Every structure is written in C-alpha cells, then in structure tokens.
C-alpha cells in the first residue's frame, strides 16, 4: 500500500513540473487573456502616418506584449520573427519594412529576424512596427474594417532542456475603413464636399497635401466643363431641381483655374501645404434660374 501511494505522489509531482513548463512563456493582445501559441487576431485602429521615406502602417508595440512566467531570467525565452511574414489583403502586393528589436528589415521577411530575449514576468511590449514603402506620388489603397492586412509569424525557444519551442502567428486586422497612403505624398482628404452659399457666394475648399520626404509637386483640375476656356464646371444636379445658366468655378489666389492647367505647389514636405482653393459660381448664360448647383471636380497631383 505504501508503495502505491509513493508512486502516485511521484506521478503527481511529475505532472506539476510538466504543467509549469507548458506555461513558461505567454503573450496577450491589448491586455487580454494569456496566449501560449498558435494563431491570434490582433485588431488595430489604422491611422497611417507619413514619415521620411516610409509610411507607418501600425505600431504593434501598442497591442502585443509577452513575458516569461518563471521570471528572474531563470529560463530565458528567445524570440524572433520568421521569414514568410508578409502583408495580406489589399496590401498583399506592396513592399515595406518591419522594425523589430532595434533593427529594420525589408518586408515581406525573406530571412528570420534577430533574437529578442525575455526573462521577466512583467509583460514586455513587442518592439514591432510595420511600414509601407512609398511607390509614387499621392496615392492610396482602401482598406475595409475586418480585413487582414498582414500576417506575422513568431518563433520562441527557451534556454533550458529542449527549449519547449512554440510558434505564433499574429493576424493583423483593421478595425476601421481607411485609405492607406502608398505614395510618397498624400492628401488630407480624398472626398471633399463643399457647400456653397446662395448665388453669387463662394466657399473655401479645405484640401491640403503633405509628403514623406521633400517633393516638388504641382496639381491640375479635371471634370466636365461648359465653356471654351474650360473654367466653368458643368452643373450635374438632377434635372428636377437643377439651376440653369450657372456652373462652378475654382479659384486660387484670385485667379480662376482651367482644367488641365498645372499649378505648382513648390516643395512639399511633412508639413501640410494647403492648395488654397475656393469654389464659386460661374455663369454660363445670360439668365440664371433658381435651383440646385452641383459639380464633381477632380484634383490630380504630379511630380515636377
């Protein structure tokens, strides 16, 4: 009988030791429950930031933290990101860079990263940021809420014994609809609605542009016009409410702009440069009748 009890006690100790090893390394997302391995969704509010030579997609140090359950650097965990980590969804065809543990790597990853050591019980935010490389002038790609924008693979192994290796995959998912800037320059709004006061009033157009590095930019207007000078944009309001004899003109520094006319903005950098545009009515006939005036006008930016 004593022998049987002794065997059960030893067996119980063995199980406890194994359980302790299984939970020696953990992570969480946004302070949630502990994650020991496998695939986890990381929901992020995307707020792209233009930076010199690159556009910040997301700072994941604000979301993912990991720690060593033993603490005291007794059995240190060694963490690295794994080749094959890449953008996904609407960003799948783009290239960028990944910041990890004081080193920046081309992204998608074609090699494993350096190793981050974690040996403390205090959750450590992972030093991890994603950037997209600008590919031209002002441009962007629409990302929808719920879309996976990147998959990052992570490997962990400890110092003692077999190291209890683990694999993690972080699926980075957008919480919001956003236009991700993919160009060296971008505008502060891609769809601007301007309400004009009653005829013959005017209104400022709140539109500006900024760039990740210094660029000489110009822009031009496009859209259907009604006059030979290409300065009065057509009234596209529904016929039932449409005003007659009037369209819309855009002005800059007191000068009416024509479609296709290049307007230089000079050198643009990270500080927003307002386009300085205002909208007003443009008369197209001798007589103006009351009604709705509506025009759709495009603004295209080009490198000088």
UniProtKB/Swiss-Prot annotation:
Pfam families: FimH_man-bind. CDD domains: FimH_man-bind. InterPro entries: Adhesion_dom_fimbrial_sf, Adhesion_dom_sf, Bact_Fimbrial_Adh_Pro, FimH_man-bd. GO terms for biological process: cell adhesion involved in single-species biofilm formation. Coiled coil: none annotated. GO terms for cellular component: pilus. It comes from the Bacteria. Keywords: Fimbrium, Signal. SUPFAM superfamilies: Bacterial adhesins. It is found in: Fimbrium. Residues 1-26 form the signal peptide. Belongs to the fimbrial protein family. This is Uncharacterized fimbrial-like protein YdeQ.
């Amino acid at each position: 009988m004593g022998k049987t009890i002794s065997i059960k006690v030893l067996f119980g100790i063995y199980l406890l030791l194994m359980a302790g090893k299984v939970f020696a390394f953990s992570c969480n997302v946004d302070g949630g429950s502990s994650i020991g391995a496998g695939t986890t969704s990381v929901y992020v509010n995307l707020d792209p930031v233009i930076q010199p030579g690159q556009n910040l997609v997301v700072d994941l140090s604000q979301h993912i933290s990991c720690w060593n359950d033993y603490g005291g650097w007794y059995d240190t965990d060694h963490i690295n990101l794994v080749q094959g980590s890449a953008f996904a969804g609407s960003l799948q065809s783009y290239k960028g860079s990944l910041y990890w543990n004081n080193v920046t790597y081309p992204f998608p990853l074609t090699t494993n990263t350096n190793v981050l050591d974690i040996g403390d019980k205090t959750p450590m935010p992972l030093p991890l940021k994603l950037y997209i490389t600008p590919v031209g002038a002002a441009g962007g790609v629409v990302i929808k809420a719920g879309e996976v924008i990147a998959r990052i693979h992570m490997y962990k192994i400890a110092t003692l014994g077999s190291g209890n290796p683990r694999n993690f995959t972080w699926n980075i998912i957008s919480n919001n609809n956003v236009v991700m800037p993919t160009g060296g320059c971008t505008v502060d709004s891609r769809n601007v609605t301007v309400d004009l006061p009653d005829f013959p009033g005017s209104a400022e157009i709140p539109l500006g542009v900024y760039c990740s590095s210094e660029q000489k930019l110009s822009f031009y207007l496009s859209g259907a016009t009604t006059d030979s000078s290409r300065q009065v944009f057509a009234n596209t309001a529904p016929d039932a409410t449409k005003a007659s004899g009037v369209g819309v003109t855009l002005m800059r520094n007191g000068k009416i702009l024509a479609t296709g006319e290049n307007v230089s903005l000079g050198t643009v950098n990270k500080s927003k440069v307002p386009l300085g545009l205002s909208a007003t009515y443009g008369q197209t006939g001798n007589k103006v009748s009351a009604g709705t005036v509506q025009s759709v006008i495009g603004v295209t930016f080009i490198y000088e």
